[in-house]
Amino acid sequence: MQSAMKGIACLGLLAALCSVWGVAAQEPARHAVGLELRGDTMIYRSVALPCRQGTGNHVWSGYAYEPWTPAQKVFALSKFWSEARRNYVRMDRVGAERWDSLYLSLIEPVRRTRNDDEFYRLMQRFCAFLEDEHTFVAVDRNYPQSAESFGDGWVLSLVTIDGRVVVNEVARAKAAEVPPGSEVVSVDGRPAAECLAGAMLRVSASNERARRYKAAGELLRGLAGTEHEVEFRRPDGSSVRVRLVNVSGEYGDSDLASLPGRDRRSLRAPFRLEWYPGDVAYVKLGSFRPGSAVKAFHDAFPEIQGRARKLILDLRGNGGGRNRVAAHIMAHFSHDTLLCEGTWRTRTYHAAYASWGAQAEAKDTVANPPVRAGFENYRGLALSEPRPHEFRYAPDRESLVVPTVILTDVGTCSSAENFLIMADSQPHMTRIGSATSGCTASPVVYELIPGMHCGICTREVRFPDDREYVGTGIAPDIEVVPTLADWLEGRDPVLERALEYLADK
């Protein structure tokens, strides 16, 4: 509940910028209605709204959609509120009354949003309060905006490391001015840490580490024409100020300079096989989605099985995919015929039970299952009994069991975490790196209004022995956290530690 209160407090503190910092207005506005938290009560207050350069009505001239009406916006807010209240599996951690209070406080600010993007950002903040990576609000509209691409040929990819926002990739033609590894010091005169905190408010994630990880890429997002004055500190200690202007759409695969070994193609590779001395196979598993990655793994497995004496499975940045794919790959590295991805439960509701529990109090539920069922259903607290999620495999299948290290980081999430749950019971497997994202899966998807939909997490997953990881992440057996100095030197200390560990096996 403390995390829920913290989420409310943060949202309440910064939602005074409900006009949404860094976006364009279709209509001029001098004030915006914001929110303020006093105790458990959300109240309104007005704040001055500064205008920004380069954000006029012309931005929307090529927008191909009819803007959402105030009525549609309020309906979308209400639809998301009600479906989350009914389906979100961790609503008991949030508190239904607080969720209701926040919803009521947002009705007027939502109605007054001045354009579609401003409304979308406010919906993102509402969603982020639930603190779950598989609970989201998304749009199908081509907003005239960008996050990494800017005028005059600028492309910047930002990441967080050592608590700082750093340039991971930059357009090669601009690399002499802002080299990879340069730190963002300020944006429009505001400290980078403050700007990052604002971006984090719109990020749906299970903990602060994951929010920070995802928010870096959103730091400079803005509608076309939005100007940013960004101060960078180069790796050599010198400083430079750059004027960046958002464009409409991203440039895609441009010619980029990156930190050594951290180009996006390598980091996002769905599959890669490399060999290290001593017949140590390094296998990059960047995704568990069906398709080319699975085929590449199957094509390479005979070589791995025939040669590898030790194994490194790199799941860093693996955002998941299908649980069945994760289990299928795990089956190649285990002799077990039964693989368990943990136990899961979901929200349940019986209207008749709720009617019987309307007058019940907590003390009445002690040693009284029928009353307890009524009490929980009336208050939206009823959950299904935990069920194991298991996969069975033939005992005579092709598999390879050798000393194995699995590399993880905060980008390891969803079915990649289910893979780690299965690995937890394998004595030959060890986790090295940093804690994972801490999110589960199975979002139920609803259309809110034409052009906007949401997903709401419906399953809570735990280890078979009932250990929790949702919200905190799965900790490694051996923690190794890279530093900016490592990246600048082209070192991968996590991989280095894995090789050291396997050398003794």
Residues covered by each model-derived region:
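Cysteine-dependent hydrolase recognition
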Residues: N368, R372, Y378-R387, P395, ...
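A substrate-binding/cap region within the structured catalytic cores of diverse enzymes
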Residues: P277, H335-D396
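Short helix/strand-capping connector loops at secondary-structure junctions
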Residues: T472-L484
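Bacterial N-terminal signal peptides that target proteins for export
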Residues: M1-L11
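Flexible, low-complexity junctional segments that flank or bridge functional domains
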Residues: A25-L311, L315-R345, Y353-A362, P403, ...
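Short, conserved helix/loop micro-motifs enriched in His/Cys and acidic residues
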Residues: R392-L407
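Extended C-terminal subregions enriched in glycine
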Residues: P403-S425, M429-S437
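Bacterial N-terminal signal peptides
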Residues: A9-V20
